[in-house]
């Protein structure tokens, strides 16, 4: 199993939405419409080697919410240090680039992971009403390792 890298995210079509440090936006806050989108948010520290793509430190997913808090709720959990992961991110004084990837673009990282372009074209998409973000999150854990997360 390999660590997920920025190259994997870029190949899947992820976009950078900003940078956080200690659970706060660093160098500007993205618009609320961007932060409330359902999908996956990946944190990448800039501590990659000179010839390697930086590894993804952690991943979070956000579903549809009535409150439209989205990724802002994740940052709140980090600031409140509600888990070991949140305490680490809040206290390590490391800036993390935040990448966003909607569930519709997750195929190369989940069911299509490790397949060539032709095989990927014939791999099923995630359109089932029973396919949850939690299941996609588990597929990510099956396919990749993350620096700060064990699962």
Curated annotation (Swiss-Prot):
One GO biological process term: symbiont-mediated perturbation of host cell cycle progression
Pfam families: Phage_T4_Ndd
Sorted UniProt keywords: DNA-binding, Host-virus interaction, Inhibition of host DNA replication by virus, Modulation of host cell cycle by virus
Cleavable signal peptide: none
A GO term, aspect molecular function: DNA binding
Function as written in the Swiss-Prot or TrEMBL entry: Disorganizes the host nucleoid and inhibits replication, but without host DNA cleavage or degradation. Only the architecture of the nucleoid is affected. May act on the host chromosomal sequences that determine the structure of the nucleoid. Binds to dsDNA but not to ssDNA.
The name this protein goes by in its record: Nucleoid disruption protein
Gene behind this protein: ndd
